[in-house]
Amino acid sequence: MFEQEDEWISKTQMKKQMNGLQDLGMELTKLSNDTLKKIGLDEDLYEAVVTYKKITSNGALKRQAQFIGRLMRDTDPAPIEAFLAKLRGDDAAHNAFLQRVEQARVRLLADDGALTQFMSDFPHADAGKLRTLIRNTKKEQEQNKPPKNFRALFQELKTVMESQGGTGEA
């Protein structure tokens, strides 16, 4: 016990860590049961979260939240945090990919020759469908209509770029 003096944590620091784990557990209670199964939680933690969702009494909710926090202490929070970050869209790689898709859409709408370049980068893309979406998007913008085709173009580009390299890295 005396060898671990350099790793000593104050009681306040420990409480902050425990509250952080309890907050992470509370984020889990907001997810659907199917999503919870995808995370791969311990069976006890999964059952505690599902039970929390069924409870209606405020006192019991508080006790169950503390129990979830207690179970979180025995669980590695890193995979859970990573999964939740990905769900929230905080994943930096995913954000960078979405920015590349947006840049491709802007280029395609601004320059008629950009489609040829895009097709050489992504030969499996459906040129006819992209050409139609680009034309309809330009018409939409001229007539100040809701951006239905603008969004459809983004989704099509995203699908094409994802199928090339998982995250769209060409």
UniProtKB/Swiss-Prot annotation:
Q: Which GO terms describe its molecular function?
A: ribosome binding; rRNA binding
Any single biological process term in GO: assembly of large subunit precursor of preribosome
Q: Which InterPro entries does UniProt cross-reference here?
A: DarP, DarP_sf
Q: Which keywords does the record carry?
A: Cytoplasm, Ribosome biogenesis, RNA-binding, rRNA-binding
Name the Pfam families for this protein: DarP (PF04751)
Has the keyword DNA-binding been applied to this entry?
no
Q: Name one GO cellular component term.
A: cytoplasm
Q: Where in the cell is it found?
A: Cytoplasm
- Protein family: Belongs to the DarP family.
Function in brief: Member of a network of 50S ribosomal subunit biogenesis factors which assembles along the 30S-50S interface, preventing incorrect 23S rRNA structures from forming. Promotes peptidyl transferase center (PTC) maturation.
- Entry protein name: Dual-action ribosomal maturation protein DarP
